[in-house]
């Protein structure tokens, strides 16, 4: 019998809290990971936890990181993710973009210094639910694939 969404989300949150992630960040990250699993994006849901744990244990991410705005204008912002997982900074960035777009008609917000941010569709859905057009993208984790008809890897996958 499949677990309920709330049990699924709560289990992920418990793991993140056990790692030392602040409560609000753990709840938000668990929501995004659970959303991915619920929407069939299994590659970006709870299956990511072992990889995130390796990053944490190898001190490649800060589990207690908090996003901060480094620079902003009425239509843009640059967010620093503090070296942590990317879910919370990405959600924060989209919420910032939505607020700015409501006032100015459009906005662009970038995030730097963060790790994997999960399923991109979660963030674009935030904009759609706000009645806006939204776009989210990420950088690639290195050269991994060959371009169409190419023989050598030259591109990242994101």
Language model features: what each stretch is:
Residues 1, 32-35:
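N-terminal amphipathic/basic leader segments beginning at the initiator methionine
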Residues 1-19:
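Generic N-terminal amphipathic, Lys/Arg-enriched alpha-helix
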Residues 21-26:
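Helix N-cap / loop-to-helix initiation motif
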Residues 35-49:
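N-terminal amphipathic, basic helical "cap/leader" segment at the start of enzyme domains
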Residues 45-98:
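Active-site cofactor/substrate anionic-group-binding motifs, chiefly glycine-
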Residues 96-109:
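Conserved catalytic cysteine-centered active-site region
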Residues 106-158:
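Glycine-rich anion/phosphate-binding loop at the beta-strand->alpha-helix junction
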